[in-house]
Protein backbone atom coordinates (compact mmCIF):
# COMPACT_ATOMS: atom_id res chain seq x y z
CA UNK A 1 0.00 0.00 0.00
CA UNK A 2 2.89 2.33 0.55
CA UNK A 3 3.90 2.11 -3.07
CA UNK A 4 0.34 2.77 -4.23
CA UNK A 5 -0.02 5.80 -1.98
CA UNK A 6 3.30 7.11 -3.26
CA UNK A 7 2.09 6.63 -6.82
CA UNK A 8 -1.19 8.43 -6.16
CA UNK A 9 0.58 11.30 -4.44
CA UNK A 10 3.06 11.62 -7.31
CA UNK A 11 0.29 11.97 -9.85
CA UNK A 12 -0.69 15.26 -8.26
CA UNK A 13 2.51 16.79 -9.59
CA UNK A 14 1.62 15.93 -13.17
CA UNK A 15 0.19 18.83 -15.12
CA UNK A 16 -2.28 18.16 -17.86
CA UNK A 17 -1.12 19.35 -21.33
CA UNK A 18 -4.41 21.17 -21.71
CA UNK A 19 -3.29 23.52 -18.96
CA UNK A 20 -0.90 25.26 -21.36
CA UNK A 21 -3.69 26.30 -23.69
CA UNK A 22 -4.92 29.84 -23.41
CA UNK A 23 -8.54 30.72 -22.94
CA UNK A 24 -11.26 29.74 -20.51
CA UNK A 25 -11.35 26.14 -19.38
CA UNK A 26 -14.76 24.49 -19.60
CA UNK A 27 -16.10 22.99 -16.44
CA UNK A 28 -16.32 19.27 -16.44
CA UNK A 29 -16.48 16.48 -13.93
CA UNK A 30 -13.22 14.69 -13.30
CA UNK A 31 -15.01 11.60 -12.02
CA UNK A 32 -16.09 9.34 -14.89
CA UNK A 33 -18.97 6.94 -14.39
CA UNK A 34 -18.05 3.92 -12.36
CA UNK A 35 -19.47 1.55 -14.97
CA UNK A 36 -16.57 2.33 -17.32
CA UNK A 37 -13.94 1.04 -14.93
CA UNK A 38 -15.70 -1.85 -13.31
CA UNK A 39 -13.62 -4.97 -13.38
CA UNK A 40 -10.33 -3.14 -14.05
CA UNK A 41 -7.44 -3.64 -11.71
CA UNK A 42 -5.22 -0.79 -10.50
CA UNK A 43 -1.93 -0.41 -12.37
CA UNK A 44 1.19 -2.14 -11.04
CA UNK A 45 3.54 -0.18 -8.80
CA UNK A 46 6.15 1.97 -10.58
CA UNK A 47 9.80 0.85 -10.91
CA UNK A 48 12.42 1.97 -8.39
CA UNK A 49 13.79 4.79 -10.61
CA UNK A 50 10.40 6.52 -10.43
CA UNK A 51 11.37 8.27 -7.21
CA UNK A 52 14.29 10.00 -8.90
CA UNK A 53 12.15 11.13 -11.80
CA UNK A 54 9.65 12.65 -9.39
CA UNK A 55 12.27 15.06 -8.13
CA UNK A 56 13.13 16.05 -11.65
CA UNK A 57 9.48 16.56 -12.45
CA UNK A 58 9.08 18.76 -9.42
CA UNK A 59 12.09 20.88 -10.34
CA UNK A 60 11.41 21.24 -14.07
CA UNK A 61 7.66 21.75 -14.09
CA UNK A 62 6.60 25.35 -14.86
CA UNK A 63 5.19 27.00 -11.73
CA UNK A 64 1.61 28.26 -11.50
CA UNK A 65 0.73 27.82 -15.19
CA UNK A 66 -2.21 25.48 -15.07
CA UNK A 67 -5.55 27.04 -14.19
CA UNK A 68 -6.57 23.95 -12.27
CA UNK A 69 -5.03 20.87 -10.72
CA UNK A 70 -6.04 17.27 -10.96
CA UNK A 71 -7.95 16.34 -7.81
CA UNK A 72 -6.19 13.88 -5.52
CA UNK A 73 -6.66 10.42 -6.84
CA UNK A 74 -6.28 8.80 -3.43
CA UNK A 75 -9.82 9.83 -2.49
CA UNK A 76 -11.33 8.48 -5.71
CA UNK A 77 -9.62 5.38 -7.06
CA UNK A 78 -11.64 5.58 -10.29
CA UNK A 79 -9.90 8.84 -11.25
CA UNK A 80 -6.53 7.13 -11.07
CA UNK A 81 -7.29 5.31 -14.29
CA UNK A 82 -7.51 8.55 -16.28
CA UNK A 83 -3.77 8.56 -16.82
CA UNK A 84 -3.11 4.86 -17.12
CA UNK A 85 -2.73 5.26 -20.89
CA UNK A 86 0.20 7.72 -20.46
CA UNK A 87 2.89 5.67 -18.73
CA UNK A 88 5.67 7.03 -20.94
CA UNK A 89 5.01 10.64 -19.91
CA UNK A 90 5.30 9.77 -16.23
CA UNK A 91 8.71 8.23 -16.78
CA UNK A 92 10.17 11.26 -18.60
CA UNK A 93 13.11 13.01 -16.99
CA UNK A 94 11.72 16.45 -18.02
CA UNK A 95 8.15 17.68 -18.24
CA UNK A 96 6.55 17.97 -21.68
CA UNK A 97 7.62 21.28 -23.15
CA UNK A 98 4.91 23.79 -23.80
CA UNK A 99 4.41 25.52 -27.14
CA UNK A 100 6.39 28.58 -25.95
CA UNK A 101 8.18 27.74 -22.70
CA UNK A 102 10.41 30.75 -22.17
CA UNK A 103 9.05 33.14 -24.77
CA UNK A 104 12.02 32.54 -27.06
CA UNK A 105 10.31 30.46 -29.70
CA UNK A 106 7.81 33.17 -30.59
CA UNK A 107 10.50 35.48 -31.87
CA UNK A 108 12.17 32.63 -33.73
CA UNK A 109 8.94 31.83 -35.51
CA UNK A 110 8.14 35.40 -36.47
CA UNK A 111 11.56 36.19 -37.93
CA UNK A 112 11.56 33.43 -40.58
CA UNK A 113 8.03 34.39 -41.57
CA UNK A 114 9.20 37.93 -42.27
CA UNK A 115 12.16 36.82 -44.36
CA UNK A 116 10.76 33.84 -46.25
CA UNK A 117 7.22 34.13 -47.53
CA UNK A 118 5.30 31.07 -48.70
CA UNK A 119 4.74 32.61 -52.14
CA UNK A 120 7.33 34.89 -53.78
CA UNK A 121 4.77 36.91 -55.75
CA UNK A 122 3.21 38.10 -52.46
CA UNK A 123 6.32 40.09 -51.55
CA UNK A 124 6.94 42.22 -54.63
CA UNK A 125 4.41 44.59 -56.18
CA UNK A 126 6.51 45.76 -59.13
CA UNK A 127 5.85 44.67 -62.66
CA UNK A 128 7.80 41.77 -64.20
CA UNK A 129 8.92 40.54 -60.77
CA UNK A 130 7.68 37.05 -61.52
CA UNK A 131 10.62 36.35 -63.84
CA UNK A 132 13.13 36.05 -61.03
CA UNK A 133 11.07 34.11 -58.52
CA UNK A 134 12.06 30.71 -59.95
CA UNK A 135 15.74 31.48 -60.54
CA UNK A 136 17.64 28.76 -58.71
CA UNK A 137 14.55 27.67 -56.83
CA UNK A 138 14.82 30.61 -54.38
CA UNK A 139 13.53 34.14 -54.44
CA UNK A 140 16.56 36.32 -53.93
CA UNK A 141 16.05 38.97 -56.62
CA UNK A 142 16.83 42.58 -55.93
CA UNK A 143 14.42 45.38 -56.91
CA UNK A 144 16.90 46.62 -59.52
CA UNK A 145 16.79 43.30 -61.34
CA UNK A 146 13.05 43.56 -61.85
CA UNK A 147 13.35 46.55 -64.14
CA UNK A 148 13.27 45.83 -67.87
CA UNK A 149 16.45 46.87 -69.65
CA UNK A 150 16.30 48.64 -73.00
CA UNK A 151 17.76 46.74 -75.95
CA UNK A 152 20.74 48.51 -77.53
CA UNK A 153 20.98 47.77 -81.27
CA UNK A 154 24.27 48.03 -83.10
CA UNK A 155 24.76 49.98 -86.33
CA UNK A 156 24.85 46.81 -88.40
CA UNK A 157 21.60 45.58 -86.88
CA UNK A 158 19.86 48.92 -87.40
CA UNK A 159 21.09 49.06 -91.00
CA UNK A 160 19.66 45.64 -91.81
CA UNK A 161 16.39 46.43 -90.06
CA UNK A 162 16.02 49.75 -91.89
CA UNK A 163 16.70 48.06 -95.22
CA UNK A 164 14.08 45.45 -94.50
CA UNK A 165 11.58 48.11 -93.43
CA UNK A 166 12.21 50.05 -96.64
CA UNK A 167 10.87 47.14 -98.69
CA UNK A 168 8.33 45.68 -96.26
CA UNK A 169 6.49 47.68 -93.64
CA UNK A 170 5.09 44.43 -92.18
CA UNK A 171 7.50 41.54 -91.75
CA UNK A 172 6.42 37.93 -92.10
CA UNK A 173 7.18 35.14 -89.68
CA UNK A 174 9.74 33.27 -91.84
CA UNK A 175 11.58 36.49 -92.62
CA UNK A 176 11.51 37.44 -88.95
CA UNK A 177 13.10 34.13 -87.99
CA UNK A 178 15.74 34.62 -90.66
CA UNK A 179 16.58 38.11 -89.45
CA UNK A 180 16.72 36.94 -85.84
CA UNK A 181 19.30 34.30 -86.72
CA UNK A 182 21.30 36.65 -88.93
CA UNK A 183 21.37 39.60 -86.51
CA UNK A 184 21.70 37.53 -83.32
CA UNK A 185 18.42 38.87 -81.93
CA UNK A 186 15.19 37.33 -80.75
CA UNK A 187 11.97 37.34 -82.71
CA UNK A 188 10.39 39.45 -80.02
CA UNK A 189 13.05 42.16 -80.43
CA UNK A 190 12.48 42.31 -84.19
CA UNK A 191 8.71 42.35 -83.80
CA UNK A 192 8.80 45.21 -81.30
CA UNK A 193 11.29 47.16 -83.44
CA UNK A 194 9.00 46.93 -86.48
CA UNK A 195 6.02 48.05 -84.41
CA UNK A 196 7.88 51.11 -83.14
CA UNK A 197 9.24 51.86 -86.61
CA UNK A 198 5.76 51.74 -88.14
CA UNK A 199 4.47 54.18 -85.54
CA UNK A 200 7.33 56.54 -86.32
CA UNK A 201 6.70 56.23 -90.04
CA UNK A 202 2.98 57.01 -89.62
CA UNK A 203 3.78 60.11 -87.59
CA UNK A 204 6.17 61.32 -90.28
CA UNK A 205 3.55 60.75 -92.98
CA UNK A 206 0.91 62.66 -91.03
CA UNK A 207 3.33 65.54 -90.54
CA UNK A 208 4.09 65.64 -94.27
CA UNK A 209 0.39 65.67 -95.13
CA UNK A 210 -0.34 68.50 -92.72
CA UNK A 211 2.59 70.58 -94.02
CA UNK A 212 1.59 69.90 -97.66
CA UNK A 213 -1.98 71.00 -97.00
CA UNK A 214 -0.79 74.27 -95.46
CA UNK A 215 1.62 75.08 -98.29
CA UNK A 216 -0.95 74.10 -100.96
CA UNK A 217 -3.58 76.42 -99.49
CA UNK A 218 -1.18 79.40 -99.48
CA UNK A 219 0.19 78.79 -102.99
CA UNK A 220 -3.22 78.30 -104.57
CA UNK A 221 -3.97 82.04 -104.48
CA UNK A 222 -1.12 83.05 -106.81
CA UNK A 223 -2.31 81.04 -109.84
CA UNK A 224 -5.74 82.65 -109.47
CA UNK A 225 -4.20 86.13 -109.63
CA UNK A 226 -2.12 85.14 -112.63
CA UNK A 227 -5.20 83.82 -114.35
CA UNK A 228 -7.02 87.06 -113.65
CA UNK A 229 -4.19 89.15 -115.09
CA UNK A 230 -3.81 86.90 -118.10
CA UNK A 231 -7.50 86.95 -118.80
CA UNK A 232 -7.51 90.77 -118.64
CA UNK A 233 -4.64 91.04 -121.10
CA UNK A 234 -6.33 88.63 -123.45
CA UNK A 235 -9.50 90.66 -123.28
CA UNK A 236 -7.59 93.81 -124.17
CA UNK A 237 -5.84 92.06 -127.05
CA UNK A 238 -9.05 90.77 -128.58
CA UNK A 239 -10.41 92.80 -131.54
CA UNK A 240 -13.72 94.65 -131.17
CA UNK A 241 -16.84 92.88 -132.33
CA UNK A 242 -17.73 93.48 -136.01
CA UNK A 243 -20.62 95.78 -136.88
CA UNK A 244 -23.99 94.20 -137.38
CA UNK A 245 -23.86 94.70 -141.14
CA UNK A 246 -20.75 92.58 -141.46
CA UNK A 247 -18.68 95.39 -142.99
CA UNK A 248 -15.35 96.16 -141.43
CA UNK A 249 -14.38 99.82 -141.14
CA UNK A 250 -11.56 100.87 -143.37
CA UNK A 251 -9.56 102.33 -140.50
CA UNK A 252 -9.05 98.94 -138.81
CA UNK A 253 -5.77 97.33 -139.86
CA UNK A 254 -5.61 93.78 -141.15
CA UNK A 255 -3.65 92.55 -138.09
CA UNK A 256 -6.43 93.70 -135.83
CA UNK A 257 -8.95 91.95 -138.01
CA UNK A 258 -7.06 88.69 -137.71
CA UNK A 259 -6.59 89.11 -133.92
CA UNK A 260 -2.81 89.50 -134.08
CA UNK A 261 -2.67 93.06 -132.78
CA UNK A 262 0.03 93.67 -130.12
CA UNK A 263 -1.16 94.27 -126.60
CA UNK A 264 0.10 97.84 -126.53
CA UNK A 265 -1.99 98.91 -129.50
CA UNK A 266 -5.70 99.44 -129.45
CA UNK A 267 -7.95 97.83 -131.96
CA UNK A 268 -10.27 100.84 -132.21
CA UNK A 269 -9.82 103.05 -135.31
CA UNK A 270 -7.71 106.16 -134.73
CA UNK A 271 -8.78 109.48 -136.22
CA UNK A 272 -6.47 110.47 -139.08
CA UNK A 273 -5.25 114.03 -139.49
CA UNK A 274 -4.82 113.55 -143.24
CA UNK A 275 -7.89 114.50 -145.20
CA UNK A 276 -9.21 111.80 -147.42
CA UNK A 277 -8.50 112.24 -151.09
CA UNK A 278 -11.36 113.19 -153.27
CA UNK A 279 -12.11 110.83 -156.07
CA UNK A 280 -10.84 112.09 -159.38
CA UNK A 281 -13.43 113.03 -161.86
CA UNK A 282 -13.22 111.34 -165.18
CA UNK A 283 -12.09 113.51 -168.02
Curated annotation (Swiss-Prot):
Chief localization: nucleus
InterPro entries attached to this UniProt entry: HD, HD_metazoa, Homeobox_antennapedia, Homeobox_CS, Homeodomain-like_sf
Record keywords: Activator, Cytoplasm, DNA-binding, Homeobox, Nucleus, Phosphoprotein, Transcription, Transcription regulation
GO CC field: cytosol; nuclear speck; nucleus
Domain-level remarks: The Antp-type hexapeptide mediates heterodimerization with PBX on a regulatory element of the somatostatin promoter.
Phosphoserine: modified positions: 268
Localization: Nucleus; Cytoplasm, Cytosol
Region Transactivation domain, residue ranges: 13-73
Free-text description of this protein's post-translational modifications in UniProt: Phosphorylated by the SAPK2 pathway at high intracellular glucose concentration. Phosphorylated by HIPK2 on Ser-268 upon glucose accumulation. This phosphorylation mediates subnuclear localization shifting. Phosphorylation by PASK may lead to translocation into the cytosol.
Residue ranges flagged as DNA-binding region: 146-205
Motif position, Antp-type hexapeptide: 118-123
Protein's UniProt name: Pancreas/duodenum homeobox protein 1
An example Gene Ontology biological process: positive regulation of DNA-templated transcription
Organism taxonomic ancestry: Eukaryota, Metazoa, Chordata, Craniata, Vertebrata
Region feature (Disordered): 36-81, 201-283
GO MF annotation: an example: RNA polymerase II cis-regulatory region sequence-specific DNA binding
Species: Rattus norvegicus (Rat)
Disulfide partners: none
Role according to the record: Activates insulin and somatostatin gene transcription. Key regulator of islet peptide hormone expression but also responsible for the development of the pancreas, most probably by determining maturation and differentiation of common pancreatic precursor cells in the developing gut. As part of a PDX1:PBX1b:MEIS2b complex in pancreatic acinar cells is involved in the transcriptional activation of the ELA1 enhancer; the complex binds to the enhancer B element and cooperates with the transcription factor 1 complex (PTF1) bound to the enhancer A element. Binds the DNA sequence 5'-CC[CT]TAATGGG-3'.
Top-level division of the source organism's lineage: Eukaryota
Compositional bias annotation for Low complexity: 247-256
Gene (UniProt): Pdx1
Record PTM Phosphothreonine, positions in chain: 151
Family classification: Belongs to the Antp homeobox family. IPF1/XlHbox-8 subfamily.
